[in-house]
Every structure is written in C-alpha cells, then in structure tokens.
C-alpha cells in the first residue's frame, strides 16, 4: 500500500477534502486544461439542454487527481440539476443502488467514483436502469419471489475510474460519452496554481506559480497540495509572498525534486538501475524490491514515469531509459549489440 503521508500522491487525502472543494471550478468556462474534453462537453451539454433531455451516460477515466469528480459536478451545474455522489465499494448490495436511483429527479446526475469496483450483483441492477430507465426488484423469497419493474426518471450516470480496462464490456458499452483525462501541462497548472492562490488570498508571483506547477507531476490535486505547503513555508520563513526562490526552497525542503519526484519515485528508478541493471524486470520482482504492491506501481507510480520518458514497459518487463540515468547523474551503461 502507498504511504498515507506521501505529499505527491494523487489520491485525495482526508485533510484535503474541504479545501479542494473550495478551490473547484463550478462551470466549464472556469475549468482549466483538457481542452478537447471541455470542447466536447460544451457541445453535448448544450445539445441536451436544447432538446430538454438528460445528458447521455458518461464515463470519465484517467489517472487519479486530474479532476474527474470536479468535472462531474460541473456537468450537473451546467445542466442545472442535482448531483448525488457515491463510490463503487460503498454499493455493496442491490438495495443500496436502488435507494439512490429511486430518489433521483428527472435529469439528475448520479456520480459513481471507482465504478470499476462495483460488485457484479449491483452491476446487473444498473444495466436496465441505464438502458431503459427501469429498476428490476425482487419481492419476497423462495417460491413466492417475484420480480417487479419500477420506472425511473431519465437521469445521467457519470462513472469515474482510474482503470477503464477493469470495467466489464457490458457496462463500458452502456456509456454514450467516454472521456479520457490526460496529465496537465505546466502552463495550465500555472493557471490553476494562480487561481487557487487567489482563492486562498495568497500573494504569488509568476515564478513561484511556475516552480510549483513544474513539480506537480501534471496533476492539479498535487499542485494545490504543494501550494498549501509552500504557503506554510512562506508564512513562517518569509513575509508570506511566494516567489520563485521561496517556492524552490520550500519544495527542496519537502524533498520534491525538479521533475516532481519524491523518495518513492527515486526508489523505484534506482531499484531498477542498481538491483536489476536497468532492467528488464518483472512487475512482481519490482514490487517486492521497493515494498509496494502491483496496483500502486501500475496505477500511481508508473503512469507519470512512463509519460515523462523515464521508464518503458516491454514484453520482458520494465526498463529505465537513458533519461533516468541522467536524472541521477549516472553514466548510461553500454548496451550490448
């Protein structure tokens, strides 16, 4: 399991929730980045409003911390409807889902985070609800049991997942709008950091925002978390304003390097370099070497390292790239031809 105190982990921390809520944009025009996704959503939402219909069911997928929950709330705001939120692991029984569905009004949004973790029993109930706006309920037990159908008002299901491949094919096929969120570029993260600083009434210059943005691993949630810790440093050590120099000092103290890596990223890369001669190394061996589970490596650590060109997945296992050697000032070994 990934350690709970990891500053740059993209999963939401309990202490972040109320602060993140205050920083979330409410409308698409205030939403920064994901330009293609934003443009598509504007069209889909306006078309649904013009037809006075519920928006088609939507699946939002991508690495954690990129704004899937925020986007679901924006959709509800833009459509002018209510949103009810839950998560896959919470819906243990069919009755849990039925209770949510029967309390929806016409056009409402039902948001299910971690939808890939729905139990098969709950998923079966979801199929007719999504397709026909009907709920099949079993009344009674044994020979006296009978099925009744309840009509549901048209609604929009928004599912969010970090593992789209883990969804069953029948469930995935029922989403009319699939949206993939990508890591953010530094320019967009600068805009997000500046906006968040304004919400926090924190003075920050362009250099300070850029320094935080480039170490945020392409993830707004991490950018906002780093901003709060840099603010603490600035208030204690300086007059409170976040400049480039202040941000550099704070982030160096927090052990977040220029690439946005912390000790766990460096541990993974150095394990492949030192213990496995640069790779290839299998996922199970790598997980044992760094003391983490497969899911943490695949879902949390690897996506950013692969996207930034520090690791490659090959049929034989993971290998580090020359860029990883350069990051640690290690001479790249000669590869036998």
UniProtKB/Swiss-Prot annotation:
EC number assigned by the record: 3.6.4.-
Protein name: Holliday junction branch migration complex subunit RuvB
Binding sites annotated in the UniProt record for Mg(2+): 69
Record InterPro entries: AAA+_ATPase, AAA_lid_4, DNA_helicase_Holl-junc_RuvB, P-loop_NTPase, RuvB-like_N, RuvB_C, WH-like_DNA-bd_sf, WH_DNA-bd_sf
Record's catalysed reaction(s): ATP + H2O = ADP + phosphate + H(+)
Subunit structure: Homohexamer. Forms an RuvA(8)-RuvB(12)-Holliday junction (HJ) complex. HJ DNA is sandwiched between 2 RuvA tetramers; dsDNA enters through RuvA and exits via RuvB. An RuvB hexamer assembles on each DNA strand where it exits the tetramer. Each RuvB hexamer is contacted by two RuvA subunits (via domain III) on 2 adjacent RuvB subunits; this complex drives branch migration. In the full resolvosome a probable DNA-RuvA(4)-RuvB(12)-RuvC(2) complex forms which resolves the HJ.
Organism whose genome encodes this protein: Shewanella denitrificans (strain OS217 / ATCC BAA-1090 / DSM 15013)
Pfam families the record matches: AAA_lid_4 (PF17864), RuvB_C (PF05491), RuvB_N (PF05496)
Residues that, per the record, bind DNA: 294, 313, 318
NCBIfam families xref list: PRK00080.1, ruvB
One GO biological process term: DNA recombination
Chain sites annotated for binding ATP: 24, 65, 68-70, 131-133, 174, 184, 221
Subcellular location: Cytoplasm
């Amino acid at each position: 399991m990934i350690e709970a105190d990891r500053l740059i982990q993209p999963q939401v921390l309990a202490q972040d929730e109320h602060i993140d809520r205050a920083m979330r944009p409410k409308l698409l025009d205030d939403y920064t980045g994901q330009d293609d996704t934003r443009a598509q959503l504007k069209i889909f939402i306006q078309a649904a409003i013009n037809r006075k219909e519920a928006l088609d069911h939507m699946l939002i997928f991508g690495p954690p911390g990129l704004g899937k929950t925020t986007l679901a709330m924006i959709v509800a705001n833009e459509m002018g409807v209510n949103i009810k939120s839950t998560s896959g692991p919470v819906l243990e029984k069919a009755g849990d889902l039925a209770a949510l569905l029967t309390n929806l009004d016409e056009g409402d949004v039902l948001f299910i985070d971690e939808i890939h973790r729905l139990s098969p029993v709950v998923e079966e109930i979801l199929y007719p609800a999504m397709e026909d706006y009907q709920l099949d309920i079993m009344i009674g037990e044994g020979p006296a049991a009978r099925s009744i159908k309840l009509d549901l008002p048209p609604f929009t299901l928004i599912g969010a997942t970090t593992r789209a491949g883990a969804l069953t094919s029948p469930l995935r096929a029922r989403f009319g709008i699939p949206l993939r969120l990508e890591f953010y570029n530094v320019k967009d993260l600068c805009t997000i950091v500046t906006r968040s600083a304004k919400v926090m009434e924190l003075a920050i210059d362009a250099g300070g925002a850029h320094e935080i943005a480039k170490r945020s691993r392409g993830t707004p949630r991490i950018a906002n978390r780093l901003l709060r810790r840099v603010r603490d440093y600035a208030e204690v050590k300086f007059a409170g304003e976040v400049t480039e120099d202040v941000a550099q000092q704070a982030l160096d103290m927090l052990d977040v390097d220029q690439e946005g890596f912390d000790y766990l990223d460096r541990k993974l890369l150095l394990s492949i370099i030192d213990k496995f001669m640069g790779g290839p190394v299998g996922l199970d061996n790598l997980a044992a070497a760094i003391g983490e589970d497969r899911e943490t490596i695949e879902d949390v650590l690897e996506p950013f390292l692969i996207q930034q060109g520090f690791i490659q997945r090959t049929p034989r296992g993971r290998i580090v790239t020359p860029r990883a050697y350069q990051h640690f000032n290690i001479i790249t070994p000669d590869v036998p031809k």
